[in-house]
Curated annotation (Swiss-Prot):
Its EC number is 7.1.1.2. The keyword Cytoplasm does not apply. This is NADH-ubiquinone oxidoreductase chain 2. It is an enzyme of class 7 (translocase). GO terms for biological process: mitochondrial electron transport, NADH to ubiquinone; mitochondrial respiratory chain complex I assembly. It comes from the Eukaryota. The chain crosses the membrane at residues 3-23, 25-45, 59-79, 96-116, 122-142, 149-169, 178-198, 200-220, 242-262, 274-294, 325-345. It is a multi-pass membrane protein. PANTHER family: NADH-UBIQUINONE OXIDOREDUCTASE CHAIN 2. GO terms for molecular function: NADH dehydrogenase (ubiquinone) activity. The gene is MT-ND2. Core subunit of respiratory chain NADH dehydrogenase (Complex I) which is composed of 45 different subunits. Interacts with TMEM242.
Amino acid sequence: MNPPIFIIIMLTVISGTMIVVTTSHWLLVWIGFEMNLLAIIPILMKKYNPRAMEAATKYFLTQAAASMILMMWIIINLLHSGQWTVLKDLNPMASIMMTTALAMKLGLAPFHFWVPEVTQGISMSSGLILLTWQKIAPLSILYQISSTINPNLILTMSILSVMIGGWGGLNQTQLRKIMAYSSIAHMGWMTAIMMYSPTMMILNLTIYIIMTLTTFMLFMHNSTTTTASLSQTWNKTPLITSLILVLMMSLGGLPPLSGFIPKWMIIQELTKNELIMMPTLLAMTALLNLYFYMRLTYTTALTMFPSNNSMKMKWRFECTKKMTFLPPLVVMSTMLLPLAPMLSILD
């Protein structure tokens, strides 16, 4: 893609998200979503091939349907209340349908089917944008209307998302699909705590974005897209491969890594609100995520896939890829747990 055109498209994507995050007017929210959607399609098709086109088409149809539902209920709420303000009380039925539309945009279960397919069909860099930046705008609207959301609806979606995020990733060998199912599970954790502590949802989103960004950057550095290719990288870049394995454990929420912080605090907050079954179900289903991450770690670190190469060690050439941002990102993705006592300010 032509660099000036790419810069313009990225600025449009960023502008659309910023409009959604900063506005309190429903019409501007819809405009921001549409700007973001129309600008992200060329990024998804950056590598022009049939799979990328199919993925971009699936993404466009899903997001367009969600935007249509959202706009329809914005108008119905306007007729009911006579105002466009996001923070005002919503009509209960409008709140349910708006939550459903935003869940479609986020990829929450049972509207999650597009996430793995779209992520698998696009490049790693496009998948990184899809699974991180594209989550900010819908979550910001859910954050603003969290006081009017139907609790039964959002808690059901969150439990289903964590379950499907765990089950879906069990039989995957494609790293992009594994990250997609991980994203579905993390979105479930964020929406579970949204009604009780919206600030904690922002903390969870921040840590998730840092961990996912670091993991994708390491995948792109190693040019790996499958578990088989990941297992072949230990003799080329042993340090990077080791970091990927630690990051996988952090994404799974294994203590004492950074990914354990949001899960720990969410379970604690839900327990304070006298919800016993909810954190129990979340903790049990989170083991599914940890299991497929540990299995991926095992196949990568302790086994080797069959190879036709008669040489045991591949040549190690000097690395020419710049890694300026990786060291601080790796530290933040793995070593934030000692800072957890400082998070008491969220209370």
